[in-house]
Amino acid sequence: MINLKNSEFFYDPYPFAIVKNIFEKEIYDDLKKEFPDPNDTKFHPSDYSKKKDIGKFNKFQLDNFLSENFNDVIKNRKTSKLIYNFFKSEKFINIIDEFLISNHINIRSLKKKKSWKNFFRKNFKVYFEFSSIPCDGGFIAPHTDSPYKIITCVMPIIDKDEISNLKGIGTSMLEATNIKYKYNYLNQAVPVSDTREIKYINFLPNQMLMFIKTYNSLHCVGPIESTSLTKSLNRKSIIVCIVKE
């Protein structure tokens, strides 16, 4: 269902990987066709988008945790439902576990003496989200992700080449330059002025960015620079996270 062979792993300032050609072409083409319309009312602002005083996100989402219409949307999308069920499966957990171990990242120490499968079954869930960020200034401010997250996978679902080249549409992997933000496990939003970009990950078709939640897993998106041609376009992606119960 997914292919992790064409991957590159990084360790500084925290572990992350870039995987190209993650899906077979036929599957990816179907995902592009089936991606829900971001203008549909079934999409809702992220919680942080509603809290303007925080100013953390400017994005919309449809997910399996909080969106009431998620099951109605996905049940009529054959390929999307197929990959959703795959990402929720133990097979996916095992594939990711083996991938991490092969790249010297071991999160098995969390399990103590319990069965690995039982440990994940009882203690973790998989979060699945259709994400949409407006291309006319949309952004995700620097943050390290919720303490409940263990692993995050971001997969662009795009079919327009011009979106990939927009300034700010990729993901910036960051390092805090202000010492008070160096330890940020609880996911405090960090001013861009207090960060330094370590690596910029282009937002490319059929690619996956995967990173491990740490106290310093700082990253951001945008603000995406708009043009007269992109005001109605969206940065569409599927996000999959392994999260603590």
What are these regions (language model features)?
Residues L82-N85, F92-E245:
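Catalytic core of non-heme Fe(II) oxygenases with the double-stranded beta-helix
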Residues N6-N103:
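Non-heme Fe(II)/2-oxoglutarate
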Residues M1-K5:
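N- or domain-start disorder-to-order transition segments that initiate the globular core
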